[in-house]
């Protein structure tokens, strides 16, 4: 825990004071309901500014996971995204999106480093338009003070994710992410980091706080 706090406190102050930086507050949950099945839950509150007072998007996502084995998971789910224009006086979302998604996650290890490959296909209804999109994310988890990520571990979370459309503009966006995380318990961890999102020729940085809570509802008390 001390190492986690030291890294966060000594992060470059200039990085967190950029006027154009956004802020994402995130919750992720994988709730195991049987040996092979679990429920995914997710909430992301995204802001145009670093202060959480100018909402950009509210994303709600859920899904059903089937665990093929400990390193392979398939998911089918639904997501809703409410999009708000920067500094808009309107309280309701200007653009509403409903999406269905199919996903496959495959994990492998090289030494102490975990590599997580996530493949996702999305069917999107953006207001009255229908779109398809493919996403691939490669994420690395690197424990710093222990051989593996367990209770009390400080770790790095690093990923790159590319988004591709099936029509119109082929390239949709790319996200590059780096964070420091702390594993509080088997089910709970926190990551604090920065994401750089590139859309066409425009790019923006986002300060991120991500809480993960994965209770096992099958565990005997």
What does each model-identified segment do?
Residues 19, 33-36, 71, 109-114, ...:
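Short loop/turn motifs that connect adjacent beta-strands in outer-membrane beta-barrel proteins
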Residues 39-41, 74-76, 115-119, 136, ...:
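Transmembrane beta-strands of outer-membrane beta-barrel proteins
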Residues 101-104, 140, 205-221:
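Outer-membrane beta-barrel "beta-signal"
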